[in-house]
């Protein structure tokens, strides 16, 4: 039976030093992967392109925070309570499986957004058994996906391996706002490892327990989600799969996807606002720039029942793969002020910016203070969070709060998914006049989150080419791990010496090159092609006469002669491709 493309790529990746199974000599563990020498170079080149786009061109700044995160942070963010997947255990062999994925393996049904009860009913209805031993499956339950650890000796303080890099940015919001002089909008990048204790990872490099994220948290005024550079992308045509069309049973899968300009998608309300649309356009451009097939990219909107607990809108950049179908590689979410408001409530530290007005003005506003004699006894340890919530209300939110409490005698507030009923006698409200120069604003956050490992695999698959006499990776020169192979035609005269000098010259000029004198020249070309080297430089007899070399281009196999003195400039120009 012929191997599918995934098997071919993984075979090449293992032989040539792109990807290896982790802990291989001990039998390996699913959900972990090692990057070999070429894999590291490729992955780092992708990350460099990411930094080029977002840090250099967009003017964002990067920070780095710890991967170990205290319980309090992830309780406030909602991950302790909400970062879960459905799990089912075999009653016989005790093997665990992710329930929704297991059902989809046996039944042609979409399990996205199904409740635990609905998943349980599907298992019973279709008599789905344990795929390992055929035993009966137990009840579907929630499983928290975070790796738990302890901070310090004695296990007194619980910590987790971070499930996303974003929380490190939110925690430092006060410092970041100060760095950006309290001017909105501003963008912050973090690139690093995140962790997800997958129940039964069976998709190789697609579903990892430890993975690299490149995330942007873009802080905006909650009432100003236009983007100043929107005109630069408004004509970009993108393939969109809106939630409404996904749910339309009268449309085929192909008909559900629409190709539309970014500008028109915003005008028609398909994309919620300009800032999400802007990042969708940038994501498309980035993926195409590194070499992802433009015909295998689409942007799918999350359905209401699959939206993350912190988001009001989210679009995934999905990339098509032969074995796994469409896989999510980038998520672009409007997280509103959920994170900053939650951390403010839990920590008691105000996380807002002061937005100056064009000119001073006198306003009527409300001072809302808690009646501690009453609420302290009722809410106890939650009193601090409630006070922080009220203190962070904007002028508009204060008006709404007072209006509701006057009309209904109470207000229901929600802090991290927990509801509190605030009665009229719990607060003291005063109407006052004051002159203001601006207002406190809790910014909303637009978050593009890139899964670098999935993107790396997709790039390998989309670059894989087979011809009658060779296999090669059609990697763009700017992305390819090794830029040039330097080859003496034969191992005699001064050819090896000159070839080694050229290799050193290229490396000193920032071009990663590799010397190879092993085997016939044709075999060496094939070896270079298979790992995606865009240029082979051959030192031959003519080199000894006129100091020129042949430069062979990987895809076309065409060769040109270039003077050694001009080789660096020639390659640097070609490596921009």
From Swiss-Prot:
It is an enzyme of class 6 (ligase). Keywords: Aminoacyl-tRNA synthetase, ATP-binding, Cytoplasm, Ligase, Nucleotide-binding, Protein biosynthesis. Its main location: cytoplasm. Pfam families: HGTP_anticodon, tRNA-synt_2b. Its EC number is 6.1.1.14. It comes from the Archaea. GO terms for molecular function: ATP binding; glycine-tRNA ligase activity; protein dimerization activity. The keyword Nucleotide-binding applies. HAMAP family: Gly_tRNA_synth_A. Catalyzes the attachment of glycine to tRNA(Gly). This is Glycine--tRNA ligase. It comes from Methanocaldococcus jannaschii (strain ATCC 43067 / DSM 2661 / JAL-1 / JCM 10045 / NBRC 100440).
């Amino acid at each position: 039976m012929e191997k599918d493309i995934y098997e071919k790529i993984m075979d090449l990746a293992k032989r040539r030093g792109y990807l290896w199974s982790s802990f291989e000599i001990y039998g390996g563990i699913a959900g972990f992967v090692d990057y070999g020498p070429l894999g590291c170079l490729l992955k780092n080149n992708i990350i460099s392109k990411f930094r080029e786009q977002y840090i250099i061109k967009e003017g964002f700044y990067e920070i780095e925070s710890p991967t170990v995160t205290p319980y309090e942070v992830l309780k406030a963010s909602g991950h302790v309570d909400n970062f879960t997947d459905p799990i089912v255990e075999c009653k016989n062999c005790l093997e665990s499986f992710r329930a929704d994925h297991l059902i989809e393996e046996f039944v042609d049904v979409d399990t996205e957004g199904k409740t635990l009860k609905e998943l349980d009913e599907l298992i019973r209805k279709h008599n789905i058994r344990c795929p390992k031993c055929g035993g009966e499956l137990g009840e579907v339950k929630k499983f928290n996906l975070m790796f738990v650890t302890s901070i310090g000796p004695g296990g007194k303080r619980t910590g987790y391996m971070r499930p996303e890099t974003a929380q490190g940015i939110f925690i430092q919001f006060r410092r970041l706002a100060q760095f950006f002089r309290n001017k909105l909008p501003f963008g912050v990048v973090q690139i690093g490892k995140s962790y997800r204790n997958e129940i039964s990872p069976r998709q190789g490099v697609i579903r990892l327990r430890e993975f690299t994220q490149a995330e942007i948290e873009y802080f905006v005024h909650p009432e100003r989600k236009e983007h100043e550079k929107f005109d630069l992308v408004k004509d970009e045509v993108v393939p969109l799969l809106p939630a409404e069309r996904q749910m339309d049973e009268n449309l085929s899968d192909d008909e559900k996807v629409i190709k539309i300009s970014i500008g028109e998608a915003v005008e028609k309300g398909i994309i919620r606002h300009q800032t999400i649309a802007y990042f969708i356009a940038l994501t498309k451009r980035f993926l195409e720039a590194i070499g992802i097939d433009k015909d295998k990219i689409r942007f799918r909107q999350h359905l209401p029942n699959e939206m993350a607990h912190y988001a009001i809108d989210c679009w995934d950049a999905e990339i098509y793969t032969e074995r796994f179908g469409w896989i999510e590689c980038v998520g672009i979410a409007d997280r509103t002020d959920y994170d900053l408001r939650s951390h403010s409530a839990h920590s008691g530290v105000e996380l807002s910016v002061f937005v100056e007005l064009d000119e001073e003005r006198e306003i009527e506003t409300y001072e809302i203070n808690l009646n501690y004699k009453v609420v302290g006894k009722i809410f106890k340890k939650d009193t601090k969070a409630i006070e922080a919530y009220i203190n962070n209300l904007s002028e508009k939110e204060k008006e709404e709060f007072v209006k509701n409490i006057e009309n209904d005698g109470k207000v229901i507030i929600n802090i991290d998914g927990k509801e509190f009923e605030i009665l009229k006698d719990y607060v003291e409200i005063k109407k006052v006049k004051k002159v203001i120069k601006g207002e406190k604003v809790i910014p909303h956050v637009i978050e593009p989150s890139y899964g670098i490992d999935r993107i790396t695999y997709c790039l390998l698959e989309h670059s894989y080419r087979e011809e009658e006499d060779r296999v090669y990776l059609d990697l763009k020169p700017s992305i390819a791990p090794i830029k040039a192979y330097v080859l003496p035609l034969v191992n005699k005269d001064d050819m090896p010496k000159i070839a080694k000098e050229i290799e050193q010259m290229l490396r000193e000029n920032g071009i990663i090159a590799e010397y190879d004198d092993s085997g016939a020249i044709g075999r060496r070309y094939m070896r270079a092609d298979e790992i995606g080297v865009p240029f082979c430089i051959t030192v031959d007899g003519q080199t000894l006469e006129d100091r020129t070399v042949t430069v062979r281009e990987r895809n076309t196999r065409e060769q040109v002669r270039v003077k050694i003195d001009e080789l660096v400039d020639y390659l640097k120009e070609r490596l921009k491709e």
